[in-house]
Amino acid sequence: MKHAENEYLNLCRHVMEHGTKKEDRTGTGTVSVFGYQMRFDLSKGFPLLTTKRVPFRLVASELLWFMKGDTNIRYLLQHNNNIWNEWAFKSWVESDEYTGPDMTDFGLRSQQDEEFKVQYDEQMELFKKNVLEDDDFSNKYGYLGDVYGKQWRAWKTTAGETLDQLKDVIEMIKKTPDSRRLIVSAWNPEDVPSMALPPCHTLFQFYVADGKLSCQLYQRSGDIFLGIPFNIASYSLLTHLIAHECGLEVGEFVHTIGDAHIYTNHFEQVEKQLAREPRPFPKLTLNPDVKSVFDFEMEDLTIEGYDPHPAIKAPVAV
């Protein structure tokens, strides 16, 4: 039987073979295709990729952060999650209050210049310490703008009110499961200019059939090597959590990507991953005593039987 991970591996192959060379906002360069869809049957294992290690702890803590409506990286740092650091760090080193060494193009330079990397690591550690310990600093530089959590839980209306999209869609799944309006959007055009990184995963929709909950994500932009594996696991986890609260089984996670791209400095890593054979997907177990999705904490989520190939490191484009 074909392993479900081939949905992702075939995406990698397709883009490497047929992608168009494009410049991008970060100056790194990509090959990309427009419009691609993957499907994962969540009843047949949790799609945490096995051809390289994907850190479930980071996926889960980021999702819980989104679900809390939080937009400050302090919560993430408190859970040893550093995946959003670079975007917040950028706002600090570009501010008038920053007096350290020049950090221009720190993402690329830290990969190419060992002497600079020492300085970068020192400044990043100082930044993290300040976010964790200094409330004023955290409020100013740990804040990412009205990113995912804010849009999910407190979307601002023109009437000056807020909409809790996530809470509302869960209630709709319970009361009107056949609705075609089971949608949450993170793309708020008015707020996009103020965001550290405008939403890449922009809109998701739920679908209930035969007692199963499925989810489709529309992702406007997908970093195939670093980002997409996280997104697959994150929205699969979200589907499990909401199905749990609504008394449903899990169905499919359908992942639709607009600009699906591989950065030019990830080619070697992608080839290395494609040379590996997938292993069985792990099993996700949720604490049955937790009834609401908003009450889950890290200790309530368990992954069993995860035996991936080793991690493959790659630079992030900021």
Curated annotation (Swiss-Prot):
Enzyme Commission number(s) from the entry: 2.1.1.45
UniProt entry keywords in alphabetical sequence: Cytoplasm, Methyltransferase, Nucleotide biosynthesis, Transferase
Domain of life where this protein originates: Bacteria
Catalytic activity annotation: dUMP + (6R)-5,10-methylene-5,6,7,8-tetrahydrofolate = 7,8-dihydrofolate + dTMP
Keyword Transferase attached: yes
PROSITE patterns, sorted: THYMIDYLATE_SYNTHASE
Subcellular location: Cytoplasm
One GO MF term: thymidylate synthase activity
Pathway connected to this protein: Pyrimidine metabolism; dTTP biosynthesis
GO BP, sorted A to Z: dTMP biosynthetic process; dTTP biosynthetic process; methylation
Keyword Transferase: yes
Protein residues bound to dUMP: 25, 180-181, 220-223, 231, 261-263
Binding site for (6R)-5,10-methylene-5,6,7,8-tetrahydrofolate: 223, 317
Top EC category: transferase
Coiled-coil boundaries: none
Functional note: Catalyzes the reductive methylation of 2'-deoxyuridine-5'-monophosphate (dUMP) to 2'-deoxythymidine-5'-monophosphate (dTMP) while utilizing 5,10-methylenetetrahydrofolate (mTHF) as the methyl donor and reductant in the reaction, yielding dihydrofolate (DHF) as a by-product. This enzymatic reaction provides an intracellular de novo source of dTMP, an essential precursor for DNA biosynthesis.
Similarity section: Belongs to the thymidylate synthase family. Bacterial-type ThyA subfamily.
Protein name: Thymidylate synthase
Biological classification of the source: Bacteria, Bacillati, Bacillota, Bacilli, Bacillales
Encoding gene, per UniProt annotation: thyA
